Amino acid sequence: MAHPRTPQQRLAVALIRVYQWVISPLLGPRCRFTPTCSQYMINAICLHGLIKGIWLGGKRLLKCHPLHSGGHDPVPQPQQSKRRK
């Protein structure tokens, strides 16, 4: 996993970590996916940046409901530019 590079990324990751350490244990294991939705968001922010990472994490949270089967759903890798330099 990459590390957050900007102060905004570090703040977002810190807030998610607080959720993981304080709130999540009170709720119990509920996530249908691996990695968990909170870890997915951290990975997405570190890999794609703050805005796209939050977008990807939000899309993932919308899939986390009883009608979705869940399973392994890793963060997509960044796409390479198709233009030649």
UniProtKB/Swiss-Prot annotation:
Compartment(s) of residence: Cell inner membrane
Topology in the lipid bilayer: Peripheral membrane protein
GO cellular component: plasma membrane
Cross-referenced InterPro entries: Membr_insert_effic_factor_YidD
Keywords, sorted A to Z: Cell inner membrane, Cell membrane, Membrane
Family matches, as PANTHER family: MEMBRANE PROTEIN INSERTION EFFICIENCY FACTOR-RELATED
Role, per record: Could be involved in insertion of integral membrane proteins into the membrane.
Family assignment from sequence similarity: Belongs to the UPF0161 family.
Protein name (record): Putative membrane protein insertion efficiency factor
Source organism of the structure: Tolumonas auensis (strain DSM 9187 / NBRC 110442 / TA 4)
